[in-house]
């Protein structure tokens, strides 16, 4: 398995953990590799590229700067202590904080439309190889509603409609939800999207397992 950047790998692990917990055992065996980031062990059944999106707005810019600098461990609640200890904030405190180890990850994020354009172009030219089922998993700094998720889904379908290699699924994860979009041909729009709510207990469990995997890899 290719060596992965520490901060990036946290999100790829978080994606695999949430997919397995919310969608079932099909995703249990995915391993963290490169091009794409998550793959079935056989290297051909399932491939999922993991990325992130953040809108270019003053609000998003301010959120990026709202890290945990200046907060001392033990002065606040358990979530803050974990962010300080492990360096990651996604899934905790409603997404208000960015941990120091994930700061550069989000600082390079593109708006949703631009990241979809980039990733669809890459899958179409074979950059991620050939898999029976190909997925794109996008972490969002903004809490999205179903309407915005549908817009992203429709835009992805339009981008790849003439491509020979394309994504079968689009997964959009914000702090509170996982939107699963079926991109296959021949489906009605109202049957393509399923929204899974992520409880506080699930967020805490996903976070804990992801950071524990980091300590194992070190």
Region locations from a protein language model:
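Short acidic-glycine loop/turn motifs at beta-strand connectors
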Residues: 41-43, 174-175
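Extracellular structured ligand-interaction cores
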Residues: 35, 45, 133
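Conserved catalytic cores of phosphodiester-cleaving nucleases, focusing on short active-site segments
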Residues: 38, 46-52
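A short acidic/basic microdomain associated with nuclease active sites
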Residues: 19-40
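Metal-dependent nuclease catalytic core centered on acidic motifs
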Residues: 1-26, 51-190, 195, 199-206, ...
């Amino acid at each position: 398995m290719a060596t992965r950047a520490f901060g990036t790998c946290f999100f790829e692990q978080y994606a695999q953990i949430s997919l397995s917990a919310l969608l079932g055992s099909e995703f249990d065996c995915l391993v963290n590799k490169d091009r794409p980031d998550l793959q079935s062990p056989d290297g051909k059944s399932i491939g999922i590229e993991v990325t992130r999106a953040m809108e270019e707005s003053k609000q998003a810019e301010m959120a990026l700067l709202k890290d945990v600098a200046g907060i001392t461990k033990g002065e606040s609640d358990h979530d803050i202590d974990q962010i300080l200890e492990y360096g990651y904030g996604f899934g905790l405190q409603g997404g208000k904080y960015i941990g120091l180890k994930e700061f550069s990850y989000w600082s390079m994020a593109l708006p949703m439309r631009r990241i979809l354009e980039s990733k669809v172009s890459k899958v179409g030219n074979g950059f991620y190889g050939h898999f029976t089922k190909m997925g794109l998993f996008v972490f969002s700094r903004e809490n999205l509603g179903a309407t915005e998720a549908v817009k992203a889904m429709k835009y992805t379908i339009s981008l790849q409609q003439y491509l020979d290699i394309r994504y079968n699924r689009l997964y959009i994860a914000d702090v509170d939800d996982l939107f699963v979009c079926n991109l296959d041909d021949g489906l009605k729009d109202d049957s393509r999207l399923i929204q899974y709510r992520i409880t506080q207990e699930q967020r805490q469990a996903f976070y804990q397992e992801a950071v524990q995997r980091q300590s194992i890899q070190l």
